[in-house]
Amino acid sequence: MSCGDVNQNQNQNCGCLADILKKILLLQRQDYDNENYKGCDKPYLGPICSTICYNTRPIMLFNCCTGAPWSFTYTINNQTSTSDVFRIEAIDDCCCTCRILYLDTATNRYLGTSEFFTINLDCVGALRCLPDTFIDLC
């Protein structure tokens, strides 16, 4: 399938990326039962899952046609800029909603914006995960 093609089996085309994004979303929501994960497959580090050090796995999404990173504009303190780093907030079939993150150069940490976008995963050719971090979501 090439970029922009329409296919009746679209959900199968984005399955691999959607599965990964669903796992990331699960981790970010800390939405698991501690009793169900006792072995190597537990999706957190440390002795108990209530110890929260990180709440975000920043991601980059790459265009399926060009390979270029997707980037979106955001405005903070009346300054408009662009970012190509995001936090997954929701996923529904082949569409995911992301929060735009930006790098605070003073602290060298990603911060969250109050700006979101929804993208069709059929338009995404690759996903890059960045190191886990804590984002203040309030």
Provide a role label for each language-model segment.
Residues M1-E89, I100-C138:
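Short glycine-rich, low-complexity segments
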Residues A90-C95:
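A short, structured loop/turn motif at beta-sheet edges
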